[in-house]
Every structure is written in C-alpha cells, then in structure tokens.
Curated annotation (Swiss-Prot):
Residues with PTM Phosphoserine: S31, S33
Keyword Lyase: no
Originating organism: Aotus azarae
InterPro entries, sorted: Cyt_c_oxidase_su4 (IPR013288), Cyt_c_oxidase_su4_fam (IPR004203), Cyt_c_oxidase_su4_sf (IPR036639)
Domain of life: Eukaryota
Membrane topology, as annotated: Single-pass membrane protein
Name of the protein: Cytochrome c oxidase subunit 4 isoform 1, mitochondrial
Gene name as annotated: COX4I1
Keywords: Acetylation, Membrane, Mitochondrion, Mitochondrion inner membrane, Phosphoprotein, Transmembrane, Transmembrane helix
Length: 144
C-alpha cells in the first residue's frame, strides 16, 4: 500500500501557547453526534450544558492552556541519563587508574622535590624574578 504524504501547504492544527488559535479545528471529520452538537451551538449558548460546552471545546482544540502548561517528567529522564554517563565515566577513570596507569615516578616524592628545590637554590636559578629571588642566602630561609 502507498502511504499518503502530508501536504504542508495546507493549514494544519497545532497546540502552542504562542499560537493560541490554530488555522483549523482539532477534529476535522465530525461524527453524527458532533455535527448535531455543532448545529445546537448555533443557538443560544445558555441552553448548552457544561458537558456540551466542553465537547465543543474539544472539537476545536486538543488541549487547554492548563494542559499545555502542565510540566512534563522529561527532566527526570535527562537527569537520569546524565547521572548514568557521569557514573560510567567515573568507573572508567577508577579502572584506568588502578589497572592501566603505573605508579607515580619517584620525582613526585616530597623528599625528591625538596632536594630539587635546594639544588635550584644552590644554582641560583632565575635570581631576578624567580625562585632564587625569594630566598635569603644569608639567613638560609625564605624572604618575608
């Protein structure tokens, strides 16, 4: 069978808050009871019951403004998916640190850093603006 494509040049129905009156009614093909109700609508509206007024509204519109403004629960799905991917990434990082990367080099030890700093001070590395400029060589302590 062949599927009939939608002609987008024709007016269409859409429920949007910024476009409150769509070009066409929500229900395009009326049943016999809906046609009778539309005929009754042409008379005085005071003779219509509340249910008939609601039915007339539902023929014209799919949702009311309250229904359009009602929040959805989509944010829960988004937050859940984000937390899943954050957790998955954290597990990958933990596994990489444990099984892929080796131990830190010995140059990261506090003793090694202290020896390297003392060596840089002894060599007077960058005496104008750098490390050696902040060291008092007479008192053997950092300048205050």
């Amino acid at each position: 069978s062949v599927v009939k494509s939608e002609d987008y040049a024709l007016p269409s129905y859409v429920d949007r808050r910024d476009y409150p009156l769509p070009d066409v009614a929500h229900v395009r093909h009326l049943s016999a009871s809906q046609k009778a109700l539309k005929e009754k609508e042409k008379a005085s509206w005071s003779s219509l019951s509340m249910d008939e007024k609601v039915e007339l509204y539902r023929i014209q519109f799919k949702e009311s403004f309250a229904e359009m403004n009602r929040g959805s629960n989509e944010w829960k799905t988004v937050v859940g998916a984000a937390m899943f991917f954050i957790g998955f990434t954290a597990i990958l990082i933990i596994l990489e640190k444990r099984y892929v990367y080796g131990p830190l080099p010995h140059t990261f030890d506090k003793e090694w850093v202290a020896m390297q700093t003392k060596r840089m001070l002894d060599l007077k590395v960058n005496p104008v603006d750098g490390l050696a400029s902040k060291w008092d060589y007479d008192k053997k302590e950092w300048k205050k």
